[in-house]
Amino acid sequence: MSENKVNLLDFDRNALRAFFADELGEKAFRADQIMKWIYHFGCDDFSQMTNVNKALREKLARIAEIRAPEISTEQRSSDGTIKWAMRVGDQEVETVYIPEADRATLCVSSQVGCALECKFCSTGQQGFNRNLTVSEIIGQVWRAAQVVGFPKDTGKRVITNVVMMGMGEPLLNLSNLVPALSLMMEDFGFGLSKRRVTVSTSGVVPALDKLGDMIDVALAISLHAPNDKLRSEIMPINDKYNIQEFLGSVQRYLSKSNANHGRVTVEYVLLDHVNDDMEHARELAELLKDTPSKINLIPFNPFPSNPYGKPSNSRVDRFSKVLMEYGYTVIVRKTRGDDIDAACGQLVGDVIDRTKRTMKKRMQEQEISVKML
């Protein structure tokens, strides 16, 4: 396909309607027709869009395309989890489909690599390359649906939930993230409830404040430590935005949101004998007392060349019980897809050579400091 063609996956509904009116001289409802073909029927061939007049179909074929990332490899876990490496330009990101009895969740990437360097995350140890475009984010959902089924194929919505918990820090790609989220929830898009679309962040405070003014989705926060000293050791972003600043922005977001039922999901990776003592649990409980929360405990998933270990079941149970004694809803996340390196913190993809890492990191730090303010 020609690089000069406009990729319609890069437009949310408002932008697509404007494109049809301003660039094509067409009525806005024609954009809605095309969106239904793309997102409800999984169609990427204009000639097959039979309720669209032939002249418009031919015009679109000349100037536009519907291009999602291609699947490079597919791995299927014994538990039903599917991990895809998807080609974005000359690199790859990873997308994970997690089916359960009552839902099916798609874990989507927002960047090629990640600049935040969280010590327990495989992606963070690989370096940062670039942000994904709107089409590369929403295209992961489109391509996954092509494999597992669009509603017109199955008679039901196969992908019921989307979590922005793949490669990258979503809030460092806000300008492309928000239109993609809109397409996930738009009736002419994938039509998901805002309570079924979750953005996870490690604490980019200015961007979280901005997100709350732009769109309403479920929020999960990557906390992973109950105090600044420990969090800074395992999550360098804490040196820029400490826990109290982070939780302050969370509370501001919750005050604007209807998608979260007034509480945030707190993600806490349990690292053996690092952040999983009973005293850590008590400290965490006190820390969150003013932030309505449900807590997801995630036993660490080891990966090569990482110093951390997975805690024993007894340590996980003790930690969980302390939090429940304080009245918190606690879920111990079941590890899914670890036999194909698709579990939390294991996504790597095909990212940059480490010799480019310093330059990319500096650019990303400038984005944190300047662009989001």
Swiss-Prot record:
Instruction: List the catalytic residues.
Output: 94, 344
Cofactor remark from the record: Binds 1 [4Fe-4S] cluster. The cluster is coordinated with 3 cysteines and an exchangeable S-adenosyl-L-methionine.
SUPFAM superfamilies in the cross-refs: Radical SAM enzymes
Q: Name one GO biological process term.
A: rRNA base methylation
The positions annotated for binding [4Fe-4S] cluster are 114, 118, 121
- Pfam families linked to this entry: Radical_SAM (PF04055), RlmN_N (PF21016)
Q: Which domain of life is it from?
A: Bacteria
What cofactor is needed?
Answer: [4Fe-4S] cluster
| Residue stretches in coiled coil | none
Residues bound to S-adenosyl-L-methionine are 168-169, 200, 222-224, 301
Top EC class, one word: transferase
Catalytic activity reported:
adenosine(2503) in 23S rRNA + 2 reduced [2Fe-2S]-[ferredoxin] + 2 S-adenosyl-L-methionine = 2-methyladenosine(2503) in 23S rRNA + 5'-deoxyadenosine + L-methionine + 2 oxidized [2Fe-2S]-[ferredoxin] + S-adenosyl-L-homocysteine; adenosine(37) in tRNA + 2 reduced [2Fe-2S]-[ferredoxin] + 2 S-adenosyl-L-methionine = 2-methyladenosine(37) in tRNA + 5'-deoxyadenosine + L-methionine + 2 oxidized [2Fe-2S]-[ferredoxin] + S-adenosyl-L-homocysteine
Disulfide pairs? 107-344
As for family, the record states: Belongs to the radical SAM superfamily. RlmN family.
Tell me, in a sentence or two, what this protein's role is: Specifically methylates position 2 of adenine 2503 in 23S rRNA and position 2 of adenine 37 in tRNAs. m2A2503 modification seems to play a crucial role in the proofreading step occurring at the peptidyl transferase center and thus would serve to optimize ribosomal fidelity.
Q: What is the name of the protein in this document?
A: Dual-specificity RNA methyltransferase RlmN
Q: Which organism is it from?
A: Tolumonas auensis (strain DSM 9187 / NBRC 110442 / TA 4)
Lineage per the UniProt record: Bacteria, Pseudomonadati, Pseudomonadota, Gammaproteobacteria, Aeromonadales
User: Gene encoding this polypeptide?
Assistant: rlmN
